[in-house]
Each structure stands twice: as C-alpha cells, then as structure tokens.
C-alpha cells in the first residue's frame, strides 16, 4: 500500500509553514510538466513540484507530487524519511532533533493508515451488525461511540500525521483506540486522601481499595482514582515518584468498570453507563511530539470555571437555552501530577433517543454506503446535504460569533462539538465539551454581561486584552476546522460546487457581523475586516510548534495557538467559477 498521500500532505504542510525556508527561500522554476520550487541546498538544490489553487484550504501553493528532486543528479526522494532527512540537513543544528522526531511521526502515521485500510471494511461491517447500517438511526450515548470509531479513521483537516500516536503499537491501537471500538477494563490507583484534590462526588464511581484486591486497611485514608491501562506501567511509576507518592499510593491488582474509548482516546465512556465519560491522562502525544495527552491539574478547575461563564452567557441569550447544551465537567480529581488525574464528564440527560454525531464524523463513510452526512441529510433534511451543512453552519456560527461579542473564543474544534438530531425538531442542537483552552477578553465580557465573573485561571494565557487573540482562535478553530474543512470536504466528494459551499459560510458570517454591530471597534466590524475581507487568515503552524521546533525556538506560548497565514478562501474574488 502506498504512503504517497501522507508524504504529499507532509510536503504541502512544510511548504505552508515555511520549514527551512521552503516557501520564502525558494524560487519558481517552470518545467515542461508544470511549476517547481527550487530550494538552495548547500552546493546543490532541492526541487518541489507545486501547483496553485484558488481558493485552497489554507494553502496558496501546495505540493502536486509526493517527492523532492535533487537538482544535481535528478534523484527523486519519494519517502518521508528521505525527504525529511534532506530538509533536516538544511535546518539549524538546534532544530535537527525535531526533524528526526517528525520522521518518526510520519512512520507512525503511515503505519496507522495502512492498519486502517486493512481493517476498514471489517470494522464498518461490525458496526453495521451491531447498530444498523444506517447511522442516522444510531441513537443514544452508546451508539454515539460508534460515530467516534468512524471519525477516528479520517485524516485531520490540518495536521498531516494526525492519525499517529507517539509510542503506541498496532496491538495497543487494536486494544484501546477508538477506531477499533474496543471494550476494556480500567485500572485503579489508591491515593492517600490528603494527597488528592477533588471536587464533586466520586464515591459512586470509584470502588474502595478492598474491592479491588488491595488491603482493607487502605479503605480508611485512601481514595481510588481510575488509571488508563496504557498509563499503568512505567509512566505511572515515574509519576508516583515525581509526586512523592511511591510507597504511599498503590496500583490495585484487579481492574473494574469496562469502558469504550471516545474519539480523543484518552477519554473513555463507561460501558454500562455511556453518558458518563472519564478523561484520563495518557503518556502519549498526538498532533506533534510536544502535544502530550496528559492532564495538567490546573486545567480541570479552568474548564469548570469556563463552563460557569458559558452558562451565564447562555442565560442572557434565550435562543441558545434549548439549542446549545454543555456537558458537565465540574467533577474531577488529581494528585498533583499530569498523569494522576481524572475528569468525570456527564452528558446532559434525555439523549437516549437522540442521534448524537461528532462534527468530526460527518465526512466518514457510513456502513451502508455514502457519507454519514448523506444519511443524516436523508433522514433529517429531506435528502439535501446542502440543507444539512447550512443548518450546521447557522447554529455553529451563530453561537461562536455571539461568544465573540462577549469577548470569548472557544477551542471547540470538530472533536469537541456533537450534533444532536431528533425527529420533529428544526436543525441540530449542539453539545459542547472541553472548555479549558479559550481566550477571554475581560473588558468585552464585562461590557456584555454587566459584570465580570471571576477570571482566576491556572493558565494565565486564557485572559487576553487583545481582540486579535480572540479572532485568531475563532478563525483557526470555528472557521477553518468547523466550517471551511467541511466546505472543501463536501466539494471534494462531489456534493456541491465549492463556491456555493464557501458562499454559505460567507453569508452566515456576514449575518453574524451585522448582528454584532458594525460601529467602530465593534466585534462585528472586526469580524468583517479581519476575517471576511482580510487578504490572508491565520493558520495553525502545528508541525512547526508541535514537533519541528522546541518552544524556545518557535516562541510558541501555546503550541495549539501558534500561527502562520494562508490565503482567505472566503473572499468573493477567490471563487472558481
């Protein structure tokens, strides 16, 4: 099976992020087969075949063939290893370890893609046998996990190695990853009560130590927290040592509570009560070696605080009371280390007959044929995928831009938004989760709410006094990942002309800008000038910040909010007609 698609995406991403000056130091060369970029390489040069598309999703120019050509002898480099070693040789010596790490990430992604291809048919068949071949009729919290399985087999919209997970084997993926829809029991750790910070009731979920094979004497003075099986070995031992808990905390020999992984993998749903999710730290990384899937203890309280702010906003906006729901993320515990933590996420009640689809699953192939979006359109939108995507965009952009008016931008990407469909209700409702990485502008929040809720966050980056920080986050998450990616995706699948789909996004954003007001300094005016009418838009530089460069080299305060720019595909002049 060819790995060319991964290499093609890698080359386009490195070009967009200008790794080793691939964009800024290259000159264009026109050869008989098309355009190439020539990058000087010591006493030689590397040639990259490119094409220009208008509009393109975050690219002005992209790779058109999965290769680099060495100018001196015509040698073609056609593997990610060969390409990255050639480019890494041009990097600052301080950055070469990052290129070596990216080589490894590419190999992991290629291996995972091959594994997915080999198992796609069997997994979809198994889901169809269990839940039915039409996912529009998959209802309730248990069936929602099957959508996660479909979504986990898709590429990330921006990151070229998004399917890879650092340090995990194929056996690990089959046993614990959402794309295989496994079921497995949790491990448990008995922690001294005085070492555990907790909020909310955990006793009904967490068994006493004696029920897990530990001495009964630990029932007094110790409390248990769940541990992911992948964390229960050496990573846990190292965490206990770092937290000063070696010999004081005890891993129980007996597992308890079967769970099923959600799309994020580190979050699992209780098999017997799938409306309850447990977010558990994992000693792995996704979307870059620096993007570790642990849980910093301070983020737990931050997420709960943001949830309270969103509740206050929703109370002032009646149209969202029934249409935008929030998972409860106020119950959590930690023992002072990023591998010793748990967030207990409760889904809202009343979803047993609801079709709950993560936004990330819309473009996934359905077990019975077509896309998930097609089957949802058939059942809920009269067979019209355009009506479906317009309804989704209307709800998403109304919510996101309303929050901008309050000085809030959420990191609600395609994995954190679930579409809720019920018979006889207009359009999808939204279910939101994971609120720990927003940007909040205190002055705008105070002006809109009439008061300023407590903004005492563990992460000082949450509070900003810069409108640009809000708009950058809104653009890179809501516009690119939750809207633009689906316009380009549906067009790629032949569902509608791209210009029509982009027009829907533009129209909904323009409506939102008008509703926010267009006076000087208003958020509506900024939305128009810095998003709708801007020549270029911020784009996440995920490979640079997450893998290629250490933080001190990239200057990234937050690797998930480190940006380059790309052409604005929403400009009317960019429509290909």
Q: What are these language model-derived features?
A:
Residues 388-406, 410:
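Conserved kinase catalytic-core helix
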Residues 1-394, 422-577:
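Nucleotide/phosphate-binding site architecture used for ATP/NTP-dependent chemistry
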Residues 413-415:
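Canonical protein kinase catalytic loop motif
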Residues 417-419:
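Hydrophobic residue at the +6 position relative to the catalytic HRD Asp in the kinase catalytic loop
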